[in-house]
From Swiss-Prot:
GO molecular function terms listed in the Swiss-Prot or TrEMBL record: thiamine binding; thiamine pyrophosphate binding
Position of the signal peptide: 1-21
Keyword annotations: Periplasm, Signal, Transport
Protein name as it appears in the record: Putative 2-aminoethylphosphonate-binding periplasmic protein
NCBIfam families: PhnS, PRK15046.1
Pfam families reported for this sequence: SBP_bac_1
Domain of life: Bacteria
SUPFAM superfamilies per the UniProt record, alphabetical: Periplasmic binding protein-like II (SSF53850)
Similarity-based family: Belongs to the bacterial solute-binding protein 1 family.
The keyword Metal-binding is annotated on this UniProt entry: no
Length: 337
């Protein structure tokens, strides 16, 4: 889930699509599911267009950026569907940027509600250069070692969903916000500096320009095919416990959407059994439906990677309420204001 420049990509109807394919649906999405050729988004958007005649217009940006854009367009909405990650989806709901919509599949998806639904499971992860480091950093304390000075970087909380997840993971791993902030203040001595993009850090790790960075499991697994020196790890706390914050892709219908019915159709399409079954095969993600268990090698690799790692999630509504204050405090303790 990297934060890229907000880019507009239009996914046009297949040549075989019906001649009545004049209607459109516009998606504002966090990135990660449209990476590379034959991505899950690309395959599903093409199939949706072929089945319905509705063209998908796709706008991509960071988790916070796409929500900020929706807020700016509140009086004249341009998007129909929002895909982002916690806590930004909760912020969108609190700011009344999402419309009430009960999907056809809500009963099969844990944590779905009348404003948004999980779309693809995902988890915070960390990566290291396995060519330059014989073993992964075992603990959070290891990351404070002087050998990582200017060789460690994580994306900026508040801008990137994965960067925000690092901050929240520190709270969890150290037992409190105060302890988490104290640690992040110390870690700043090794941090290269702010990064608006999580995804671009992978190439830097692969080339050895930095040794360690943050990421997310789905994105990192997909990137490892093109970045052979990169491996995934999770640092342990002082009890030796490794944990990973669950940060799913989440989808919702935009309040006042210009093509609301088309938005509903696309949401239901992406949450269908057929679409969910292929998310691991095409994009290394994990389906959110309780009645879908893929059998492909990508799914097996993702589940194997998480062995011995405890997944967790906070009360996201509480996180959304305190997010602005937490981001301000992060800037203060890291002296990055």
């Amino acid at each position: 889930m990297k934060l890229s420049r907000l880019a507009l990509l239009s996914v046009f109807a297949l040549a075989s699509a019906p001649s009545w394919a004049e209607s459109v649906v516009t998606v504002y999405s966090i990135d990660g599911l449209h990476d590379g050729d034959n991505s899950w988004y690309q395959v599903q958007f093409d199939a949706f267009t072929k089945a319905t005649g509705i063209t998908v217009r796709y706008v991509e940006g960071g988790g916070g950026v796409v929500v900020e854009r929706l807020a700016k367009e509140r009086t004249n909405p341009q998007a129909d569907v929002l895909v982002t990650a916690p806590p930004f989806i909760q912020r969108a709901a609190a700011e009344k940027l999402l419309a009430n919509f009960n999907t056809d599949t809500a009963s099969a998806i844990p944590d779905a509600n009348n404003l948004y639904s999980p779309l693809v499971k995902n988890y915070l992860s960390f990566i290291y250069n396995s060519k330059l480091l014989k073993t992964a950093p075992a603990s959070w304390q290891d990351l404070l070692d002087g050998k990582f000075k200017n060789k460690l970087q994580y994306s900026t909380p508040g801008q990137a969903a994965d960067g925000t997840a690092v901050m929240l993971q520190a709270f969890h791993s150290f037992g409190s916000k105060d302890a988490g902030f104290a640690y992040l203040g110390k870690l700043q001595a090794n941090n290269v500096g702010p990064s608006a993009s999580t995804g671009k850090l992978t190439a830097l790790v692969n080339k050895g320009e930095i040794y360690v960075a943050n990421g997310d499991l789905q994105m990192n697994l997909a990137q490892m095919e093109r970045n052979p020196n990169v491996k995934i790890f999770w640092p342990a706390n002082d009890k030796g416990e490794r944990s990973a914050l669950a940060i799913p892709y989440v989808i919702g219908l935009v309040q006042g959407a210009p093509q609301s019915e088309n938005g509903k159709k696309l949401i239901n399409f992406l949450l269908s059994k057929e679409a969910q079954t292929r998310v691991s095969e095409l994009s290394w993600g994990m389906p959110v439906r309780s009645d879908v268990t893929p059998s492909d090698e990508h799914y097996k690799a993702a589940t194997a990677a998480l062995e011995g790692v405890q997944s967790w999630q906070p009360n996201w509504d509480d996180v959304a309420v305190s997010l602005s204050a937490d981001i301000s405090r992060w800037h203060k303790v890291t002296e990055s204001e």
